[in-house]
Amino acid sequence: MSQQAGNAQRGRFDEEPMSLGEKISHRMDQLKEIVSSSCPCAGKFPPVAIVLIVALIILGVIIAVPLVIFLSPSAQAMSSGTRDLSSHSIRHPKVWPKTEKVQDDDLSAIQMTSLLPPNVSTCSGFGFACTGSIDMIIPSSKRCDGLKDCSDGSDEENCKECQSIYSCRAHIEEESEKKDKTSVLPTLICLTAEKLCNGVENCPDGSDEASCRSKCSKDQFKCSGSDACLPISVKCDGVSDCENESDESNCNKCQKGAHKCGKNCIKASKVCDGIPDCDDGSDEHQCDCKTCSGSEKALCEDGTCIMRSQVCDGKHDCLDGIDEENCPGSCSNERFSSKLKLLTCDDGNQYSEVEACSGLVEACELNCPKCDPKHTFTCPAVGGIHNKCIKRSKVCDGIFDCEDGADEKKCTPVKECVVESSIQFTCDNKCLESSRRCDGVWDCEDKSDEKGCDKCPSRSFKCSADKKCLPFHTRCNGVAECSDGSDEHKCSCQECLGTHHDTYMCSESNRCLKRGEVCSPYSMCPNATYIDKAYCASLALKNSGLRP
């Protein structure tokens, strides 16, 4: 454009303001010139087309950005957190002694609350989260105690107050800090007694080696073989500060939060840690979330602190057994209201009395008040030993199971067995009366005495497809004895859980499975519910080490 034309153009602009349409047309021309400078081919298109293309590109970018964020791995991880499928707890480290429950904005958690009994808590939000291992949370009682409980030692960093016997500044105080009364609390190094007067300076100012004196003051004492003067207040606190543990002997009263257990004091960090140290377990009672905190702990409503692995493990660890109520694979009170009579057997597990006294659980042979008269043989008590319940297939098998050998007496030799007239029959190299056939009791180890049966007695189950009679307590045990699986169909809570200790009741399908076979790795329950699926997800996380 010539200078004269340009001046004329400017003069026209000065004289007549552009209309809205002219402004838009002018802007489109400018946009076309900008685009054409980068892409000469754009000059062939009208300005309107250029504007539409640019607008579509901008719109595509606006739509793509949130879509990329949504599909990213981190977004998927956050999305999966809407269903509580793990017990990871990520919390900003807090310095001792703050133990109040942290606010929601301090806590990002994926918890297994949907799988826990309603009256058992994991005390989420309490304790100290190790900086280098977000899935490891230690109780507040182990924070700044002079011992590194986190793998990265973060529990002993940024300490403002120590729970150990001795503390010193992490750095030497400057003169300006001494004069400044408004400065924050200094960071401390926490030391146990064994770090004092050991010839190694653990404090920057060497104060841990400067307190060694030949004579201590009235409120101090010395351990045998040590030059360190320790305060009397650390006696009987459950922590052995002396090598010979003399500071923990002859204790009539415990100090500094320690628990009296017989003649001993249990230190505060071992009280409410989920592991009973007293014979009566009293050190794990009357706990709260401040004391029973940590990634491996669980708190019962009655104040008992237990290990999280003890929840829903088939054993009653809370005082009233609430740690086993409404667990995945169990029946709610509405579906299964009968209270089972449980026996603790020699393997430490708890069994229903029906199962324990059926003769099928060897660990329970000496724990039954009364043996099942139909399915077992009762060995008489000898020398103060309780009656022993053995399964009937062990009778006359040539092996003495009873102390007095009663199970091998009155046995008919096989060569004298009358089998021609079907009065008797043989199996497992023993002779049995014909009345033992098809009676719903396994007298033969190979179970052949219960095959080929046209009828089965009451308190037994008939496999119609196989013509077999099964003992009543084998129904709904998670193992299909019938070829058509009919012995595992339409199971009730009483049949599944009232008779067996190692079974899992599927939430909605009336199907009973062996607990160890429920997940493979996904739930094997027909029409598996969220709880069934979450149980297997929890088990997978636990087996992979991602959850306690």
Swiss-Prot record:
Gene3D superfamilies: Low-density Lipoprotein Receptor
Positions annotated with a glycan in the UniProt record: N119, N244, N527
Stretches in topological domain Cytoplasmic: 1-49
Entry keywords, A to Z: Cell membrane, Developmental protein, Disulfide bond, Endosome, Fertilization, Glycoprotein, Membrane, Receptor, Repeat, Signal-anchor, Transmembrane, Transmembrane helix
Stored CDD domains: LDLa
Compartments reported by the entry: Cell membrane; Endosome membrane
GO biological process, one term: positive regulation of protein localization to plasma membrane
Coiled coil: none
Mutant phenotype after disruption: Severe sterility at the restrictive temperature of 25 degrees Celsius. Accumulation of unfertilized oocytes in the uterus, although this is controversial. Simultaneous RNAi-mediated knockdown with egg-1 results in a fragmented eggshell chitin layer which often accumulates at one end of the embryo. In unfertilized oocytes, disrupts the homogenous distribution of cortical chitin synthase chs-1, pseudophosphatase egg-3 and kinase mbk-2. In a egg-1 (tm1071) mutant background, causes polyspermy.
Function: Probable receptor which is required for the oocyte-to-zygote transition although its exact function is controversial. Redundantly with egg-1, seems to be required for fertilization probably by promoting the interaction or fusion between sperm and oocyte. Conversely, shown to be dispensable for fertilization but required together with egg-1 for the formation of a continuous and cohesive eggshell chitin layer by maintaining a homogenous distribution of chitin synthase chs-1 at the unfertilized oocyte cell membrane.
Protein name: LDL receptor repeat-containing protein egg-2
Origin organism lineage: Eukaryota, Metazoa, Ecdysozoa, Nematoda, Chromadorea
